[in-house]
């Protein structure tokens, strides 16, 4: 609940993560805020941002301003590997066919440790993990479908090569191992599955393998939402706060549509 009170427009070539601190400082300068709860999507999570938020909190306290800076930040999928142990530990005791929310800790290494420090600063942060079985099932099924289609294609080309080696003749140009490798590799790459299906481009014969350990790990990630937070709210409430961000994004889409109706795209003669 609440009403939007302000917005700012940043240069289009400015990375999203670099807008976080300036925006918070601007709000604190404009309004007598006592508590700030930052809820942001995956583009804003960085250890540097978390460290800077802690420094800003300390600076405000030194100035005598009693301002609480809290955050709920989503972990980008590309960084899920940093949380593999926490994911396995939390998911291991949970059902896969029911929604659940759990919490654990994440040890982050500060990138702003002074050069004189003998070891980088390690900070314990609260990590909330949520599982949506419906989303997990959709993603797993979609991936499995793509994998099976590629495997069928690979088996088809492998069968043609074996038949050619046995003396069978077919219409058109004969299929070569190098040609099959190149075509299959591009098919796998186009399906965004090169991290799962490995095509041996250096081998003389056409061959490929599936990384089953990686496949099981991706199935573990399916349907998961990872949130880093310093709030004291219950884990389920943290998840709900983050999901309310969708309402804000929906409002942005509506505003953008209204703006596009107006003649704002002018060109000079």
Task: Give a label for each model feature.
Residues 1-269:
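Anion-binding and metal-coordination hotspots
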